[in-house]
Amino acid sequence: MTRDRQPPFVSSASGARFITGESFFAEWSDNVHSGSGPVLYRHAFPFPEIGPGLVTMIGGAPAAGKTTFSMQMGVEMVRFNPEIRLLICNCEMTPAALMDKTLSRLSGIDAHDVRHRRFGEEHADRLAAALATIETFVDRIAFMTAPFDIRNVAATADATGADVIVIDYIQRFTIPSDDSEARHRVNRMMDYLRRFASAGVAVVVISAVGRSRDRAGRSSYASEGLSLASFRESSELEFGADDALILAPVDVDDPEVVRLAHLKARHGMQVTQDLMFDRRVQSFSLIDPAPVAPSTPAVAPRRRTSLAAEIRLLWESSAPAADDASREAGSQSRHGDGDDAGEAQ
């Protein structure tokens, strides 16, 4: 090539910003030859892949076990990866209630007994062992408290040095906007979460889903009828996520057997897993091992950019999406108004 080499990031007088293929190729090809894959955090199950730069969305019906599943996955993540920190942003359950789930799972003591603190001598050894295990990682877990908005998520993640953020659940969180329509709010929320991921954080998003028709034509939350279109409020949820999964009973008459349907995998294979949900001790386990193990993770980087700064950048660079009425008004303004506009319509 005879042209002068251009810098990787180009900002022209017109305001266009881009990366040239020529300048990008050398760094990318070096990375290909190095053989180091993406950073992935091992957790309780072979899939989904969770790591810096990835937004993983898990939907599910009420009482399907979304929170229990995400808590088990998050806790095992900090146990397997002693270098990472976890931030749990749960707007419906207290830290004590969430840790009760973990205590029940790790000790094998009935969750009802744990909740009511009904312990006997027969529980002593298991209780002591579980508490000792929790003590080894609890200093790397933080629980965000109200307000449940995206600014607080960013500020808390920065303050705690979180490497993984769990949002539970997205439809209940607010953004710095006057936009009160749920669909637009969720759209913007996904914009922010994608920026967080780009800053080097792993983001796990829990979402509500809507009912669908089962094979018998009934309105149901059974896994057979749920799809990417089932995520509530916004199509931006399935578009914005790297991986999208739905946790639902295989048969509504047998809620103990659930399916984690892998509906979207932007970077790799889709692996649907059937699980046994033991509600007595708040624990999920694989019914059959996954056919293919995920790739060996690379060494995780330890630093990232400020998430609060990412919010400021995104907020200053774009306005909230206009609602349908505003778009219609704008269209009429561009094409004229009054009698002529009415005749044109």
Which role fits each region the language model picked out?
Residues 3-109, 312, 317, 339, ...:
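The Walker A/P-loop phosphate-binding site
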Residues 5-19, 29, 108, 114, ...:
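C-terminal regions of RecA-like/P-loop NTPase motor modules
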Residues 41-46, 76-160, 175, 253, ...:
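Cytosolic-facing regulatory segments adjacent to core modules
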Residues 56-58, 87-89, 144, 204, ...:
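Hydrophobic/aromatic beta-strand patches that form the interior of the parallel beta-sheet core
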Residues 69, 94-98, 123-126, 149-152, ...:
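Helical mechanochemical/support elements of P-loop NTPase systems and associated helical scaffolds
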Residues 114-120, 142, 174-186, 217-229:
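Flexible beta-alpha connector loops of hexameric P-loop NTPases
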